[in-house]
């Protein structure tokens, strides 16, 4: 019963938000609205500067380790389960896999974006 109430509530809230989005007035883009704002001054250069590929790789590596933390956060609750050996084994395998990946990136000089 609780599942049905949750699904019904989520469906109704989603439908309500979609209907409100259709009823809201349409916004129109014009040159002043789409230009970058720099403290009241005219823009000096382009706001679309390219990123270094090395910086992008470091950012992706950071996201992977952030995902690892998100996956390991529920571990204290999982340890309270009956079969903790499998949970700990999978957690250690994930940590070892990410440590090997970090070591590989380090050896390949993938973490240095200054060069």
UniProtKB/Swiss-Prot annotation:
Topology relative to the membrane: Multi-pass membrane protein
| Location of the protein in the cell | Mitochondrion inner membrane
Q: In the UniProt record, does the keyword Manganese occur?
A: no
Annotated Gene Ontology MF terms? NADH dehydrogenase (ubiquinone) activity
Q: Which GO terms describe its cellular component?
A: mitochondrial inner membrane; NADH dehydrogenase complex
Q: Known Pfam families for this protein? A: Oxidored_q4
Keyword field contains Plastid:
no
Catalysed reaction, written as an equation: a ubiquinone + NADH + 5 H(+)(in) = a ubiquinol + NAD(+) + 4 H(+)(out)
**Entries under InterPro entries matching the protein:** NADH_UbQ/plastoQ_OxRdtase_su3 (IPR000440), NDAH_ubi_oxred_su3_sf (IPR038430)
Task: Give the protein's function.
Answer: Core subunit of the mitochondrial membrane respiratory chain NADH dehydrogenase (Complex I) which catalyzes electron transfer from NADH through the respiratory chain, using ubiquinone as an electron acceptor. Essential for the catalytic activity of complex I.
The record's annotation in PANTHER family points to: NADH-UBIQUINONE OXIDOREDUCTASE CHAIN 3
Q: How does it assemble?
A: Core subunit of respiratory chain NADH dehydrogenase (Complex I) which is composed of 45 different subunits. Interacts with TMEM186. Interacts with TMEM242.
Similarity field = Belongs to the complex I subunit 3 family.
Name recorded for this polypeptide: NADH-ubiquinone oxidoreductase chain 3
Instruction: Specify the species.
Output: Loxodonta africana (African elephant)
